[in-house]
């Protein structure tokens, strides 16, 4: 039961860090390529 309580306290912290980093990455991509429906580095 102790391990389960540890998991319940670690998972929200890790998910908050992950989603915060993902949001920051999306914000930076949107800053360099504003309103881009297709990104220039993905077009072939």
UniProtKB/Swiss-Prot annotation:
Keywords: Chloroplast, Membrane, Photosynthesis, Photosystem I, Plastid, Thylakoid, Transmembrane, Transmembrane helix. Pfam families: PSI_PsaJ (PF01701). It is a single-pass membrane protein. The chain crosses the membrane at residues 7-27. GO terms for biological process: photosynthesis. Gene3D superfamilies: Single helix bin. The keyword Thylakoid applies. One of its GO terms (cellular component) is photosystem I. It is found in: Plastid, Chloroplast thylakoid membrane. Belongs to the PsaJ family. May help in the organization of the PsaE and PsaF subunits. PANTHER family: PHOTOSYSTEM I REACTION CENTER SUBUNIT IX, PTHR36082. This is Photosystem I reaction center subunit IX.
């Amino acid at each position: 039961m102790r391990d389960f309580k540890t998991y319940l306290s670690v998972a929200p912290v890790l998910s908050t860090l992950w989603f915060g980093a993902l949001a920051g990455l999306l914000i930076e991509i949107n800053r360099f390529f504003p309103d881009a429906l297709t990104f220039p580095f993905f077009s072939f």
